[in-house]
């Protein structure tokens, strides 16, 4: 059985771990000075840290939308027997809720609430 593992960018796994385990990341939106970026795509953690270290305001994040999740599911559902999505904990973000709503249209998608963030979430992803 061919299974695809998907997580959001907050799982903090290294590029090597992601590649070795064929994990797909969905980047959260990072808001810096009212400007939106995609985590790990159009802004790096180093850029965020440098911004804050220079006295800038803390950045915030926004969950992936239902539509963004649906786009990712559409991309992988045809080629995989199952898709497992492990999200940032539902107590921290709307990622889990949005992924569940998007998954209603994809019977081979299962959404898992990691109940964690950063490396805790990453460990759940690696165990999958």
Each model region followed by its residue ranges:
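N-terminal glycine-rich anion-binding loop in soluble enzyme alpha/beta folds
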Residues: 4-65
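Short beta-strand segments
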Residues: 7, 87-89, 112-113
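Class I S-adenosyl-L-methionine
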Residues: 19, 74, 100-104
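Conserved beta-strand scaffold positions in the cores of enzyme catalytic domains, especially
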Residues: 25, 60, 85, 109-111
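N-terminal glycine-rich phosphate/adenylate-binding segment common to multiple enzyme folds
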Residues: 68-96
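Active-site histidine-anchored catalytic micro-motif
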Residues: 79, 93-128
């Amino acid at each position: 059985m061919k299974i695809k593992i998907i997580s959001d960018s907050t799982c903090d796994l290294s590029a090597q771990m992601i590649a070795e385990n064929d994990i797909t990341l969905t980047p959260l939106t990072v808001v810096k000075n009212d400007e939106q970026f995609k985590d790990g795509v159009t802004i790096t953690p180093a850029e965020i840290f440098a911004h804050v270290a220079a006295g800038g305001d803390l950045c915030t994040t926004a969950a992936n939308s239902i539509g963004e999740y649906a786009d990712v599911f559409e991309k992988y559902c045809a080629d995989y027997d199952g898709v497992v999505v492990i999200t940032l904990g539902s107590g921290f973000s709307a990622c889990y809720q949005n992924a569940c709503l998007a998954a209603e249209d994809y019977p081979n998608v299962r959404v898992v609430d990691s109940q964690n963030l950063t490396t805790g979430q990453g460990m759940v992803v690696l165990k999958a």
